């Protein structure tokens, strides 16, 4: 059986190419945690898509490199046109510093507009190039796994091309707090793109929590235990601590060559205790802080001078960039100063290497190390910690680990956790590690070795892939609307079959169109374009003439069913030949007549004044919130307020309501995405539909039964019962439909509604997890649909 295909997309390929002739190339393995991690991914047929590490400008070079890389399962992405502005600019000078809490460089702040815009355009273009390569090689059924901040726009490009494509996105760096992330000008675009993925992964719960908070604060979406809910779509957000391939390190450390290296290094170090640091030469790795802490230790522990050494391997990453030359110079300064202070002719306390070393030599160093010192100021995971533990078979060295490294949440139980900014604390930790008893070392090592052994790369990748496939194929996403849970078991919603809608419309003799208002007949309601007051609701400008034409057809009855007040519907629809149902059908009129109250008898509304008082109290204390009032319901809306503060205020409000004005009232409370609604029991669009239909029947002489229903809306969860009201199996039985006037409710025969399955279309706007049969993306699609229906009027 063929293995499933996985397309791994990252900035760099696992190999770096070097041109050795016009048509010849050599390759070296690329450094980096992702490369190390995915070496153990064997369950999939993997194709790796990324930059080959070299610019290739000629066609022959691109062709020969592509052919050679294909033999290694790699597909090159050529970024010559945008590489500098994209990689060195937007990725490394804007995204990377913000994600690591450094902020943007001062020179960018002084020339932000020009610099940022040009680099962001390069970023978009580069992501488009990545997309083009993925599209060229994609086969149906492939899973596309996007990695890191370099390709944050890629998920959206992929989903726009093929909405059924399986797409995951994983971040290997920290994700900053929402306050830090807010400083990014393109913050919304990047978040929205990432949310189009089926699964979003992070190393730690802290990073995931920051991402969720940023989405809530900036986009105004809701977060649940499963992930982010945005207009009915749920994006799963989960935590996957990355591991290593432990057997590779364990087996390597047992090789005879490595054992010889171990003996040699021990002899070279002259019996001194070894403190090891293995880091990229980077501002976030805290190497200067490490040196200062070691200096502090030597100052306060004279007995250890000459008996302990610090070997720092600082792997160069971005040669030629000013910031990295500064950190390199700073490290060299500290090394020279400390060695001059505590060194001797025969030995120095610090050896600093500006290079990477052979893998076998690295494993040998790990194996004989007494203390691994990790002082990252911010770090994604730090796989060096796991590599060290895997190689420690005999020595059982101690891990000192920064609490700001992602590994701190995984390996903290078997390590000494430190704040790298606290020099004295790190110095004390060095002393604790060097003086630790053998039994305590064994205990800590056993804890961490067990974790590293069982949380391998293979496990990490399997977990991510299984959850990605589970989300897509098994539909185990939580199914939530923007207002409340609809419960499990909703059928998959399909895109509206426009051809069938129009064809059945043209064949029918008595059509009923039920249309919502907000988000349906208004302009598209995006989170960044939210209304501030219900009175500002206006009909989509492109609908005015089309709606008038639709309502002029004697075969068609149009009902606008909204929670809006009567005056709002009068203002927008008073000139049309249609029915208006205000406040969820509590008030009804044909535009040629007067409003009729359809409030059920014995409805108690004494609770309204008390609830209104509480709502006003919180409105005054929540900037950006507002109150919507009607005769049978009240809504407190905080969609324009700070999202986190609004949610906190909503929680407090509910406590006030339940303790006071609604404690014994016959009301329903609906907690929406960014609102709290209190209304009389039974006030939903579905429950009002019988009364509305009865009124229409009473006032309209119908020669034939209703044989076509189109119901379109952007409704709250509690109102989605309107979608199921007309399900064909329900119309087979007689319905009790209330008519107006003093007469008793009449029994109306099922001949009033004679609806077949192919003639009923329930449509949700912008939601795919809904009780409706079908969905449309936005009200723009409603405009187009109504325009096409008009061409079949009087058919």
UniProtKB/Swiss-Prot annotation:
SUPFAM superfamilies: HAD-like, UDP-Glycosyltransferase/glycogen phosphorylase. Residues 4-469 are annotated as: Glycosyltransferase. It catalyses: D-glucose 6-phosphate + UDP-alpha-D-glucose = alpha,alpha-trehalose 6-phosphate + UDP + H(+). InterPro entries: Glyco_trans_20 (IPR001830), HAD-like_sf (IPR036412), HAD_sf (IPR023214), Trehalose_PPase (IPR003337). Its EC number is 2.4.1.15. The keyword DNA damage does not apply. Keywords: Glycosyltransferase, Transferase. GO terms for biological process: trehalose biosynthetic process. One of its GO terms (molecular function) is alpha,alpha-trehalose-phosphate synthase (UDP-forming) activity. CDD domains: GT20_TPS, HAD_TPP. It comes from the Eukaryota. PANTHER family: ALPHA,ALPHA-TREHALOSE-PHOSPHATE SYNTHASE [UDP-FORMING] 4-RELATED, TREHALOSE-6-PHOSPHATE SYNTHASE. In the N-terminal section; belongs to the glycosyltransferase 20 family. In the C-terminal section; belongs to the trehalose phosphatase family. This is Probable alpha,alpha-trehalose-phosphate synthase [UDP-forming] 4.
